[in-house]
């Protein structure tokens, strides 16, 4: 659901930036699918409004989130 994704992207940006991405974080989120983007990952360019993209750094810490 795109509305759920947007709500969760805002939550991640407000509450989880700098936190490690863990199974507990993944299980707490309702968006489906969730794509975790690591530095250097190749990504596909198709737009899926309900997909939550969580960007992490080399230490697996959350640095950004958006829907696409």
Curated annotation (Swiss-Prot):
Keyword tRNA-binding included in the entry's annotation: no
Top-rank taxon: Eukaryota
GO terms assigned for molecular function: serine-type endopeptidase inhibitor activity
Main location: secreted
Pfam families reported in the protein's UniProt record: Inhibitor_I78
Temperature curve summary: Stable at temperatures below 80 degrees Celsius.
Localization in the cell: Secreted
Disulfide links within the chain: 5-67
Cellular-component GO terms for this entry: extracellular region
Activity across pH: Stable from pH 6 to 10.
Keywords: Disulfide bond, Protease inhibitor, Secreted, Serine protease inhibitor
Its job: Elastase inhibitor. Inhibitor of A.flavus elastase with a Ki of 40 nM. Inhibitor of A.fumigatus elastase and human leukocyte elastase. Inhibits the fibrinogenase and collagenase activities of A.flavus elastase. Does not inhibit porcine pancreatic elastase, trypsin, chymotrypsin, thrombin or A.acutus AC1-proteinase.
Other information: On the 2D-gel the determined pI of this protein is: 7.4.
Protein name: Elastase inhibitor AFLEI
């Amino acid at each position: 659901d795109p509305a759920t994704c947007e709500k969760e992207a805002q939550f991640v940006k407000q509450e989880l930036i700098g936190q490690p991405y863990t199974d507990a974080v993944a299980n707490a989120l309702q968006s489906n699918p969730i794509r975790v983007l690591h530095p250097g990952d190749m990504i596909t360019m198709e737009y899926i409004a309900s997909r939550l993209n969580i960007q992490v750094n080399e230490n697996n810490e959350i640095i950004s989130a958006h829907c696409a």
